[in-house]
Amino acid sequence: MFSSNKAPNHRLRITAGPRYDPQTHQLVHVNGPSPIRIRSPYLTADIWVRIKEYTGYPEGSPSSNPYFTHPTTSANRYSITLSLAFAEDVNGDDLLFGNDFDHPIRDYLPPGFNAAFKVVKTMLDPSIDGDAYSDTPYLYSPALASWNQFRVGELVPPDTKKAAVEADPVVLEGAEGSGKAVRESCGLPADAAARTKYFRDEETRKGFVLEKGRVYEADFGNPYLDFEEFAVHVPGITLNISKYVSEKNNVLRYVLKNRTTGEEYLVIGFTVVLDGAQEKTDDGDEVD
């Protein structure tokens, strides 16, 4: 949401937690091999964030990650990778992923925003929906139709903790173990692009259930959002929005939530720390 003209007082800090409340968040070590783990009554999640040409917090973070050399993911400029195990069944149509805000942003939207959104809706993600001009703006997509890669894993036995995950994974479309039968029984296409198109249909999403205790992996990213330059590059349009960043308008949230109940499962905050602002250094390994 944010061509090379990066303002010197802009640095990123990425945090993640189970709720909107930033007090529940922990610092994400961007481009690091290990995830942060988040537990809540709703799920257990492991989260990795990768960003090309990263210069943000914490100090000493790698500027890149091997993820960006993989043939499938090399075009992306950033990535949010998730490994999820839900505490209860979740209907596929209820699972939303996207951005929202707790304050109006209409006065901060740069010229060209509507044209850029039309390009996104028409060419990149037809399933996206939202209202950027409301008092509580949002842009959500059905998660199953918007994630670049989606992998169905094993079922974790009851009363068994979600196992530790491998370091620095690149999640690719497919399945592990008993997850292969799940994909086959649901008729999920093997190709990632075909799967996103498959799940654009509401009834198809309603017919898919993310099972309690089963591990699901997802990867989301794109080449359009440039956090180094604080610009959006969609086909035919570039929006440089660094000048719209302020102390009151400096957080881009990615949210995984339930459409029906409104419950948030995960909140990942991309915060622009302005020059002179105090940097938080919470290094916790896990948040409940």
Say what each PLM segment does.
Residues 1, 67, 96, 100, ...:
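Intrinsic disorder/low-structure terminal segments
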Residues 71, 243-245:
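Sterically constrained small-residue positions within well-ordered secondary structures
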Residues 247-253:
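Extracellular Ig-like/FN3 beta-sandwich strand-entry sites
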Residues 2-167:
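N-terminal onset of structured domains
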Residues 251, 259-288:
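Short beta-strand elements
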Residues 125-243:
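Extended, solvent-exposed segments with strong compositional bias
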